[in-house]
């Protein structure tokens, strides 16, 4: 909060400098926690439709991010890391560098997503999607699925190549036979 005379920091623990994939990873983690918690909030008739919608939102969100990043890369890229003078000004494409950067951002996002899925279940900053499930047996099962998915994302962030693979993995961990 800033005024002409003073600046106050609220929740300074959230002041952070980190990987480019941090914000998109945090967003996806919240989508996934909503996805995994839904059996505690909906009847089976509407459950599948809603969960599939959440997974579609994840895929569309990252694709929108990718397209916007690509647009900005091509129109507003400045600085010393990937200057146009090294690529376009030499008659070369910067697509390889762009794709490498997007892959790196995705890998960071996947790992951050998994970490946040753990933090929101295991720390003091609980997730309302799970906390509001009154049936503790059901809640613990859904939280366990969430934690197992988060573990997979942390340990295998480099092998999950895109949002479609991530949502397929979510379906695997969400199956009735899992746990």
Q: Each predicted region: which residue ranges?
A:
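Domain-wide signal for the mature, well-folded portions of proteins, strongly enriched
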Residues: 1-4, 27, 49, 151
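Active-site acidic catalytic loop and adjacent metal/ATP-binding pocket
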Residues: 1-24
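Regulatory N- and C-terminal appendages and interdomain linkers associated
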Residues: 84-179
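Glycine- and acidic
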Residues: 9-13, 41-48, 103
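Active-site activation/catalytic loop segments of kinase-like enzymes and analogous catalytic loops
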Residues: 21-91, 113-129
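Short amphipathic alpha-helical segments, especially helix-boundary/capping motifs
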Residues: 3-5, 38-42, 93-98
